[in-house]
């Protein structure tokens, strides 16, 4: 199966520039799903957009957005095109989108880490990285919902040394991802995407930069794998 996908990627690489090929290869090799970010009910567009950009910058491939009262919107000038490269999953259906999101992440094997002060919290430097984790961030005003706090596996905080009690959410995400990414880099944990995942991601990215990318993929598959 992977060989087939490699053939599809080779077809795309035959029509995109060598510089793009090199860029895709380099970035895909540093992408991760070991960490994923969850935004719950974020209402400020500039914060939501900045988080998307931070995910791309730190190699986080998946961003999960829970829309309860507020719709997730991206400001292009802030996101700087990050939405093309990061996989965005929206949870806005059903009676409780927050619990729907958490359940899906737990089914994928993620530990749920709530970024909120708690009697049992640890700092981002102390957080156990031995299991894939979903980092949940809430609004600056209300924070993370009680539904998520009740089912969270761990609680984490950023050390503070001033009078202000918290960072802006986009700053909190950037600091957290920076610290955890560096810790993963220094660890022996297998946190990178598998070769199969990297190939699939590079195919997806190739389609995004080409006009009629989806149609091209269909044509490649028909030509390469049609039955005799």
Predicted region positions:
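N-terminal-biased segments
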Residues: 1-15
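RNA substrate-binding interface of SAM-dependent RNA methyltransferases
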Residues: 14-120, 179-185, 189-228
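Glycine- and other small-residue-rich loops at beta-strand/loop junctions that grip anionic moieties
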Residues: 40-41, 137, 161, 165
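Short amphipathic alpha-helical segments
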Residues: 50-51, 77, 125-126, 147-150, ...
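Short, hinge-like loop/turn segments at secondary-structure boundaries
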Residues: 79-84, 130-133, 175
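Active-site/ligand-binding-proximal alpha/beta "capping" segment
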Residues: 114-160
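Structured adenosyl-cofactor binding patch, chiefly the S-adenosyl-L-methionine
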Residues: 148-197
């Amino acid at each position: 199966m992977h060989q087939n996908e490699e053939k599809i990627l080779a077809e795309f690489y035959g029509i995109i520039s060598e510089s793009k090929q090199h860029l895709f290869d380099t970035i895909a090799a540093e992408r991760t799903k070991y960490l994923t970010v969850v935004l719950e009910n974020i209402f400020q567009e500039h914060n939501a957009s900045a988080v998307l950009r931070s995910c791309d910058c730190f190699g986080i491939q998946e961003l999960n957005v829970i829309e309860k009262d507020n719709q997730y919107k991206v400001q292009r000038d802030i996101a700087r095109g990050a939405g093309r490269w990061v996989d965005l999953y929206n949870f806005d259906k059903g009676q409780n989108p927050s619990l729907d999101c958490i359940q899906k992440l737990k089914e994928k094997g993620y530990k749920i880490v709530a970024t909120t002060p708690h009697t049992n919290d640890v700092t981002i430097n102390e957080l156990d990285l031995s299991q894939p984790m979903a980092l949940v961030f809430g609004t600056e005003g209300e924070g993370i919902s009680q539904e998520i706090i009740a089912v969270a596996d761990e609680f984490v905080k950023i050390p503070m040394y001033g009078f202000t009690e918290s960072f802006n959410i986009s700053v909190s995400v950037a600091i957290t991802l920076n610290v955890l990414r560096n810790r993963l880099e220094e660890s022996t944990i297998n946190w990178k995407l598998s070769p199969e995942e990297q190939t699939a991601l590079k195919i997806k990215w190739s389609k995004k930069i080409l006009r009629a990318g989806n149609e091209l993929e269909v044509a490649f598959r028909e030509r390469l794998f049609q039955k005799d």
